[in-house]
A protein has these predicted regions:
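C-terminal accessory/binding modules appended to enzymatic or scaffolding proteins
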Residues: 201, 213, 218, 222, ...
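Substrate-contacting helices/loops that form the catalytic groove of nucleic-acid
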Residues: 177-212, 270-291
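C-terminal binding/interaction regions
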Residues: 119, 123-124, 137-167, 172-174, ...
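Flexible, glycine/charged-enriched surface loops at secondary-structure junctions
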Residues: 57-65, 166-169, 232-239, 269-280, ...
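Active-site-proximal loop/turn and secondary-structure-junction residues that shape catalytic pockets
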Residues: 70, 127, 239-242, 250, ...
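Glycine- and Gly-Pro-enriched alpha-helical subdomains that act as flexible
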Residues: 72-113, 244-343
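Active-site loops and adjacent core secondary-structure elements that bind or stabilize anionic groups
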Residues: 1-201, 216-234
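Gly-rich Lys/Arg/Thr-decorated short loops/hinges at beta-loop-alpha junctions or inter-strand turns
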Residues: 23-35, 111-117, 193-210, 288-309, ...
């Protein structure tokens, strides 16, 4: 297949639309089910590169959950804990025996479930039945992978009455070294972003604390790979091989840090006994529970706890999760890694990151205030690596 006609472009009025190879060669994909759209393919091709890089850097299967050309979550395939199984809504499945790929998607989808609603999924490895069954129960637009087992494909083809988008990509495909895009009729050309994220990139530790565990090195690489395919400006918090907060597309660096930090905080607050024991009605769906939890742990909690409202969601009225209780719980969050796609211009980013348990940071460096940023890291005993490489993505 040399080209594929699409229903429309970014919006329904943008017609005609298609994807094709400029050199006339075959497309590196096959559509096995559904009719993927323009934005679906943007998510699919960006997400595929991300999981391919994660697999190469860590040796583990990887998954990502994309929305609007940025990852809402991404992870490598480490086993789930009982608490994670609960907050990712898979405790009713055989999660203890999930394949590594299924664990990766459970983590990628579970990190920020509000943002992942209606995601496009990318998988580094052949999709197995475990992963397909997990995908089947979520609201999702589609999936791309290098292959599918017969059982997995049968499961996925049942989704959306047979209209779920399933794409197979050639894992051996390598794009040309130069890439092009047009804006306002003008063609832009640049070298493809082929930077390898490896141990050498994070070897320049500029803080007093120079101790990096193997897990910290892994999480630094995971954060930088995620940022490589996230709309800039971007910041990513990572713990145990998975993104727990991605701040994408912000014009201000500190707003990235705050946005991603709040998402990371929400991820950890969802693990608190107060949230785990919320008395949901049995009829409340997973998506409705996600929405209710998001409001409950936020500043507008009375929207879900007010008389006349709580009865719609809970069997009994939950107690308020006070600001003091939340802070006490968040103070237990430790060993978080923070990656940034460009330098921190002010030390306020470090102050905010520390509140979310950040112990390790990877960023390019190069600010006129690098010394202030380093001093603030030293104040909190944070280990920080300067990569010397910016990772903007537009």
């Amino acid at each position: 297949m040399k080209e594929l006609e699409l229903k429309y472009g970014c919006n329904p009025n943008q017609k005609p639309s298609k994807i094709y190879m400029e050199d006339g060669s075959e497309l590196p994909i096959k559509v096995l089910s559904g009719k993927p759209g323009y934005i679906n393919f943007l998510d699919a091709f960006n997400g595929w590169q991300l999981v391919r890089d994660l697999k190469k850097a860590t040796g583990l299967p990887a998954a990502t959950s994309f929305k609007h050309v940025s990852p809402a979550g991404a992870s490598i395939g480490l086993p789930l804990t009982e608490t994670l199984a609960k907050i990712y809504w898979v405790e009713d499945m055989d999660w203890q025996n999930f394949s590594p790929l299924a664990c990766a998607y459970a983590r990628a989808r579970g990190a920020d479930r509000m943002s992942s609603f209606g995601d496009f999924i990318s998988l580094s490895d052949v999709c197995d039945k475990d992963t397909a069954l997990l995908i089947k129960r979520e609201v999702s637009d589609g999936v791309i992978a290098p292959g599918y087992t017969e059982e997995a494909l049968e499961v996925l083809k049942q989704k959306k009455k047979g209209n779920y988008n399933v794409i197979q990509i050639d894992p051996e495909y390598v794009p040309a070294p130069l890439e092009h895009k047009q804006v306002f009729g003008v063609t832009f050309e640049q070298g493809r972003q082929a930077l390898a994220i490896d141990d050498e990139l994070i070897s320049n530790i500029v803080t007093e604390n120079k101790e990096l565990s193997e897990e910290a090195k892994r999480d630094m690489k995971v954060s930088l790979i995620i940022l490589k395919y996230t709309q800039s400006n971007s910041v990513c918090y990572v713990k145990d091989g998975q993104a727990i907060g991605v701040g994408a597309g912000q014009q201000s660096r500190v707003h990235c840090t705050r946005l991603a930090g709040q998402k990371a905080d929400n991820w950890f607050l969802r693990q608190s006994p107060k949230v785990l024991n919320l008395p949901f009605k049995e009829s409340i769906s997973r998506a409705e529970r996600d929405n209710a939890i998001d409001v409950y742990i936020g500043d507008e909690y009375m929207d879900v706890l007010a008389d006349g409202n709580w009865e719609k969601t809970f069997t009994e009225k939950p107690a308020v999760f006070t600001k003091e209780e939340k802070r006490a719980w968040l103070d237990q969050m430790t060993d978080v890694t923070l990656g940034s796609d460009a330098f921190f211009p002010f030390s306020d980013n470090i102050e905010r990151a520390y509140k979310s348990g950040v112990k390790y940071i990877a960023q390019p460096g190069g600010s006129v205030r690098d010394a202030d940023v380093i001093d603030t890291c030293n104040k909190y005993n944070i280990a920080m690596a300067f990569t010397g490489i910016r990772l903007f993505h537009h």
